[in-house]
Amino acid sequence: MKRITCMIFLLCTVFVLSAQESAKTLVVDLKSHETKKVLVVAHRGDWRNAPENSLQAFQNCMAMGVDMIEIDLKMTKDNQLVIMHDNTIDRTTDGKGKVSDYTLAELRKFRLKNGLGRVTFHSIPTLEEVLELTKGKILINIDKGYDYFQEVYKLLVKTQTI
């Protein structure tokens, strides 16, 4: 039993270290003018197998070997940054209205819809949750986020993802 536990620990350690190294390698490739590597970018995550912009959609991307995810930001009524492409939550959740009309706690009550419009158990993630999930594993392209530059920067520092 000790041997199995040690093996699992070693495998997990190797996986975590290689994941952290992979993000660093991707940054080098992204900045290089000489690389011939094509980066695979997933717009709103793996929206075919999970609700778009859900933590599961981003987790699926990492499992598939995607290099980068593209996300969009919206600000809640209580100044929390969440991941949402549209100006309203109408299409992607079982709620209605603008993100800015709700607090984060209120938004958490809504469920994300899958690509076929069916309600799932997934909720709207915060930027901080996405940064923690993807830290050192995959690159993130933050689109529609310039208006929130200062808030994003603070979260990057807080999560040590800068």
Where are these regions (language model features)?
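Phosphate-group recognition and catalysis centered on beta-loop-alpha active-site segments
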Residues: A19-I162
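Bacterial Sec-dependent N-terminal signal peptides
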Residues: M1-A23
